[in-house]
Amino acid sequence: MTLHNLKPATIMSDTLLNEQDYLDLQVLWYLYQFSPDYVQGEYDASHYDQGLIDLFMQPGQYTHADLMYVVDRQHDHMANVLPMYSELAASGQVELTTTPYYHPIMPLLMMDGWTMEDGIRVNKESWPEDVQNHLITGMDLFEDKLGFRPTGMWPSEEAVSPAMVEPVSDVGIQWMVTDEEILMKSTDLDGNMIDVDIASNLATPWLVTGADGGEVATVFRDRVISDRIAFQYGTMTPEAAVSDFIAYLDNIRQELLDAGEDPSEHLLTVALDGENWMFMSEFQHQDNARPF
């Protein structure tokens, strides 16, 4: 496939782009949201698309019809995504989770005010009904599009607090994921601070109980290995990245064995935001990280 570089001489210069340049940029912007391997039919459920392949090979000078062709193909492919998700969930291959509808920071909604670092006071009441509305709206949309109601949740920005446990539990969310730093700042039932450097603590789901008895199982992601996938492995060869990943897991497993624990009774959580995948696309340009 052709790697396009639109008028490199214009970068950091006073040269103006013309209408054709902007049209080329539009087409390339949408075109490169497709994987070249996908449009060549090399992925499961993908089909060979000669029209897109021709546009990949064309060195600019695109037309408005070309732009519409690419956008229409995007719509066609996106229409297949949710049905495929539903199929995978129905077969038990994956579990799909929801997130609050408008990406609210739920702990802030639950707080009755706070003082910012510059000393400015934010005065507000606690808004648990807002939290529930975001959750229910997100779950309703999920059910409408996928055909079933989720029981797991990714909190916006992984932000959690004791106060939000009740509204989350009340809407039927059974489990959620957040960061190991939250666990590090938490206490067990005996009031002891939890040491996340102990493998059996981090690689274990915890049952979090709210003030009124609501319960939500919570897994705390291993930040080290999650961040390696998000930010480091994209600069390594697939072989080196996989070797590092497996070695890390083996070390956790050995720590559990040394502590007299059964590794099969533990769960190590790797969690990262979807937009971090951009860091995975540099695997020596090998098939958008598929070898990994």
Name each model-derived stretch.
Residues L109-G119, D170, G191-D195:
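Aromatic- and acidic-residue-enriched segments that line the glycan-binding/catalytic groove
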Residues H77-L88, D130-F142, V160, M164, ...:
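Alpha-helical packing segments of well-folded alpha/beta enzyme cores
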Residues I120-E157, D250-A271:
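CE4/NodB-like, metal-dependent polysaccharide N-deacetylase domain
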